[in-house]
């Protein structure tokens, strides 16, 4: 493992709206292609200028407006007055032996987010974050250790992809991000509009052109939003974090189930499948002697029987989190038994390959650990100043 760090201020405790920050400018990545065209026309430019800017951003992937050599200085000044390009600062990069790379980025207001690059047999896949913190309250998850501070803007979500891609552009080996999973910190459907804007931007044929079938959005189960998403006409993949096959167990480990129990959740999932004719993937974290009993596997098979032809189950090895030490990873034997019960019932399932086990592997863990160190450093510095008086 290699780790590169840069100095930065600790994450601020006081919330401040981005638009109220002195000198704040939104990222131009937050505009759709049509919105960029409209903005250019409103500022006295021809439509083709917006097309040129779009190409500079997503095909040449420049990091400043000054690099756009066929754009007039006057128009560049207007762009600089209204936007920034990439709003993220790189704080930490952790590289795993298996090629997984975990990034810690700092937002304009000093808050921290994680992004993960995974090398798969089918190409480079990036897992993006959609919120600072999370309010869903899953009892096994590192992401929820810090409650939601704010939603990310569409530009901040797009910027994660752009910075990861820039790394490979700079290497000059021709590799490109081909797959995106919206499974990082936060609940994507709790930041619905910005996530939808992000999806349409990265899927745009004139931009990054990441195919819809190569994009997956994961939700903890906001049933009304699943139905709404079904009607958007966005042909991306949907994954649902299930993690338990009955209401009692699911409510005990996922607070969201108290608002949207399995009956409501599966009603929404069935609507999604009927409307889109797309397969749904279920994520199931294997927690030792909690949700990994053979009877749990049978319950899961029964629960998904009605939609078996258009559903798939990922069994996920648990990455332990120190703050949730009452949970541990299921043994290989228990996972194998669970898997066998599902297969005997004709369930399409797989035990998901692990990535980055030698770094802060759990989602949100790098961010949480960094914030702890920042706080400890701030306290130590404050204590030192006090003693020096």
From Swiss-Prot:
Q: Which residues form the active site?
A: 114 (proton acceptor), 363 (s-methylcysteine intermediate)
Q: Where does [4Fe-4S] cluster bind?
A: 134, 138, 141
> Where is the region Disordered?
370-389
Gene3D superfamilies in UniProt = 1.10.150.530, Aldolase class I
List, separated by semicolons, the cofactors it needs.
[4Fe-4S] cluster
Name any Gene Ontology BP term. Answer: tRNA methylation
Gene Ontology cellular component list: cytoplasm
Which residue stretches, if any, does this entry annotate as coiled coil? Answer: none
Primary site of residence: cytoplasm
Record InterPro entries: Aldolase_TIM, Methyltransferase_A, RlmN_N, RNA_MTrfase_RlmN, rRNA_lsu_MTrfase_RlmN/Cfr, rSAM
Say which domain of life the source belongs to. Answer: Bacteria
Q: Which cysteines are joined by disulfide bonds?
A: 127-363
Can you say where in the cell this protein is located? Cytoplasm
The Enzyme Commission number assigned here is: 2.1.1.192
Catalytic activity from the UniProt record: adenosine(2503) in 23S rRNA + 2 reduced [2Fe-2S]-[ferredoxin] + 2 S-adenosyl-L-methionine = 2-methyladenosine(2503) in 23S rRNA + 5'-deoxyadenosine + L-methionine + 2 oxidized [2Fe-2S]-[ferredoxin] + S-adenosyl-L-homocysteine; adenosine(37) in tRNA + 2 reduced [2Fe-2S]-[ferredoxin] + 2 S-adenosyl-L-methionine = 2-methyladenosine(37) in tRNA + 5'-deoxyadenosine + L-methionine + 2 oxidized [2Fe-2S]-[ferredoxin] + S-adenosyl-L-homocysteine
Tell me the ranges covered by the Radical SAM core domain, including all copies: 120-358
Q: Where is the composition biased (Basic and acidic residues)?
A: 371-389
Give the molecular function GO annotations.
Answer: 4 iron, 4 sulfur cluster binding; metal ion binding; rRNA (adenine(2503)-C2-)-methyltransferase activity; rRNA binding; tRNA (adenine(37)-C2)-methyltransferase activity; tRNA binding
**The keyword rRNA-binding is assigned to this record:** no
Give the note.
Reaction proceeds by a ping-pong mechanism involving intermediate methylation of a conserved cysteine residue.
> What's this protein's family per the entry?
Belongs to the radical SAM superfamily. RlmN family.
> What does this gene product do?
Specifically methylates position 2 of adenine 2503 in 23S rRNA and position 2 of adenine 37 in tRNAs.
The molecule here is called: Probable dual-specificity RNA methyltransferase RlmN
What species is this protein from?
Answer: Streptococcus thermophilus (strain ATCC BAA-250 / LMG 18311)
